[in-house]
């Protein structure tokens, strides 16, 4: 359903070029009695340009993708890359996630890098949802901008903002992402999930 009675909009998204996505998971399918999962929101970048592109010091070859967001991981409140695909593949997590995607120009990679430089950690008031929606809006422009109500940004509010668009994808495939790493204070560290 379209927000506020307006017709739902379709974002241009060809299966070529650079594809930016914002994905949100409300946590409901992973919540249990007395244990609420609040969900997660992240950004994805899919390279289908025919050549390698670079995001910070990461080469993203044609046909590969990268995901990124800030996390509230104990001792590591920095910017983590490709953690979400590992959770999806190894643990079956984030089922029911919703994604919105659009094409961007390669010049927009600089906008993403600048945003990452200025906003490289999770905080209570600037959580993963806040971080992701503000990055998305900085890159895509007014026509594709997501609008939320209130001051606190949550996956649920991002899902509500998605209702303005008719091109929302369920359980987007992130299997072409690479290994997990993080940036904290400008330094890159390779990571692995515990088995």
Regions found by a protein language model. Give the residues of each.
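Non-catalytic ligand/cofactor/substrate-binding and regulatory segments of enzyme domains
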Residues: 2-126, 138, 158-195
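Surface-exposed patches in mature extracellular/periplasmic domains of secreted proteins
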Residues: 119-128, 141-153
